């Protein structure tokens, strides 16, 4: 078996897309599952309510808090299950405080963390709507955990893979009728006026629907998968 290679195509604060070559389906699926359930992240585990006059049960608000994604520093934290403390400590957790009076809506950005580097990833997640005279005050403890324990510790929302496509155009059969270019739903193909031929311009965007193959009158185009590339 050839050596597996991983190439990052694009990456930002919200997503990463990469290409894996020299692997089979079982290995790529294992990598997908590891991304979902093995990578440690912070999530709120316990909530102590000091006051809650809102029209929402403590349990419901605690559940919402648990699903708020929190930025994580794996160099300074250890898994709660591997920590020597009895309950929680700065090595495995961080404390956040939520406090507010109505009328107003409290958002994830209102959670104040004792560590400015460990805070909600997004500030705009609505948590509770307070009416006039209602008040909420609580302390939440976020601990380092893994997705295999609970979904709130999953670092990804969607983690998927697809087979890598390979598109071959037979120049002898192709008459440049542009039928395949017009019918492709993802604009993978384009007509090169200088060379007077069809060319592939966005291969990775191909969903392998094979619409181009079906609509080509001369069967000049072929779409297939690369067995060891995803």
Question: Predicted regions span which residues?
Answer:
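Protein-protein interaction/assembly regions in multi-subunit complexes
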Residues: 1-230
């Amino acid at each position: 078996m050839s050596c597996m290679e991983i190439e990052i195509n694009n990456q930002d604060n919200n997503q990463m897309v990469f290409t894996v070559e020299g692997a089979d389906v079982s290995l790529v699926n294992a990598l997908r599952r590891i991304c979902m359930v093995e990578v440690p992240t912070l999530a709120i585990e316990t909530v102590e309510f000091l006051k809650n006059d809102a029209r929402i049960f403590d349990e419901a608000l605690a559940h919402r808090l648990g699903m708020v994604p929190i930025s994580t520093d794996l160099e300074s934290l250890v898994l709660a299950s591997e920590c020597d403390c009895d309950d929680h400590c700065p090595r495995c957790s961080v404390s956040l405080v939520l406090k507010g009076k109505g009328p107003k809506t409290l958002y994830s950005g209102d959670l104040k963390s004792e560590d400015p580097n460990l805070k909600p990833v997004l500030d705009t997640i609505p948590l509770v709507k307070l009416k006039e005279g209602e008040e909420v005050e609580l302390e939440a403890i976020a601990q380092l955990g893994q997705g295999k324990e609970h979904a709130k510790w999953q670092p990804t929302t969607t983690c998927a893979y697809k087979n890598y496509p390979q598109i071959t155009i037979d120049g002898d059969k192709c008459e440049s009728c542009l039928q395949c270019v017009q019918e492709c739903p993802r604009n993978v193909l384009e007509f090169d006026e200088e060379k007077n031929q069809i060319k592939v311009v966005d291969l990775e965007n191909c969903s392998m629907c094979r619409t181009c193959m079906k609509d080509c009158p001369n069967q000049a185009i072929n779409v297939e998968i690369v067995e060891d590339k995803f």
